[in-house]
Amino acid sequence: MKVLVYPPNSLILADLVERFGHEPVVLMKEVAKHVRDAEIDAPPLNITEEDIKRSLKYVSVEEPAGLKGRIGLLAPLLEKAEASIILTDAPPTYGCMGCAVANELFKFLIRKKGIPTLEVRYEGGEKMEEMVAKIKDFLERLRKQEQEAHEAKKEGIGESGEREAV
């Protein structure tokens, strides 16, 4: 399952997601595409026309350019995500986003999407084990749900729980 991690540039969360058999949906992959894009003059500082068009699906044209640029870059992550983990109150070492308005809007868009989401508060110190345990439990539940859905599909059982005609 594709799991969006927030902050989307958190290597620590991305590693946890990968260790539990899911695909992390992270900002680094999106930036990598831009760095290799011939359309961009000074990667990764510039954004493309497509980024701006994509951002207009989520924000008004009157919003500041910085917000549109950030949301345009983050939008593909949101569109790919099948589940998400939001780490709140994390220190900048977990992945600084740089713009509070873009942060809040992006978290709102994740919640609005209606995908399975775990919101866990960063507390540090000895509470880290609890945080990692919550993330582990969430990822294991996702794996189990994914396997059950796969088995049901294999047996020809639809989402309603009834056997479908094959």
Predicted regions and their residues:
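An N-terminal assembly and electron-transfer interface module characteristic of large anaerobic redox
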Residues: 1-166
